[in-house]
């Protein structure tokens, strides 16, 4: 609740121009004069501040603004920083679901939207310096997978929306499609395995589902492979173990440097066969409570495992030669 309220305030501040985003670092900066808004500030120069035990507090509006800016710029290891070159893959806080921001040489794509109405998701995109999305991929059709996408799409105006075929078109799915259809800037594309496109110098390929339909609709969700230079990452979305085995049987290339595990790292996915097929050096578990058995399976093949529960927002970066993780 508190995160959502803060996100709404932040989104509003960005829209009104009180918060500026540095496109190079993604760090926010505070401006007390909004875009097109005259903000009259009282004269604080003669105000006597109480003694805070030697703590230097600047007086005047400019001093307060400088202090606020220094506090923001002093944040170490800013988790939302996105490079303007290379490949950045960032897992965002997305409630019960998953949202992955992909930036390649200045081009942007969002995989999934997580649960909720999208205020927190949109705030994180703005914190990452993203004001526009080139593509959005709806990884599933349920509310936990795409709930936050309509608001993000309304503000970010993506050029493409790739969506899975769905047997059951629920409220979240219908709201997403309605939002996309109302936008004159967004082209809808039914995603099928084998579809491939370039995002900057990154090649994005839809590798799953290997077949449809399924008794368990989670296996109808999309899985994505991203190749950048000599490096690669798999984002498997919301499929479960049976869907992973179908990917293996389909003979699609699953070998990758990094793996964003399906189902956030729950026991229902990341089966032993998949772990052996991918053999990732890096594995990200985005669920709130990933299964210990999944961690063990990954560590046994030599993976460095990072969990949302421990690190929050997690980032992969590639220069085309090496993939590294920055939790």
Question: What would you call each of these model-derived segments?
Answer:
Residues 4-45, 49-327:
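Non-globular, low-confidence helical/coil segments that flank catalytic cores
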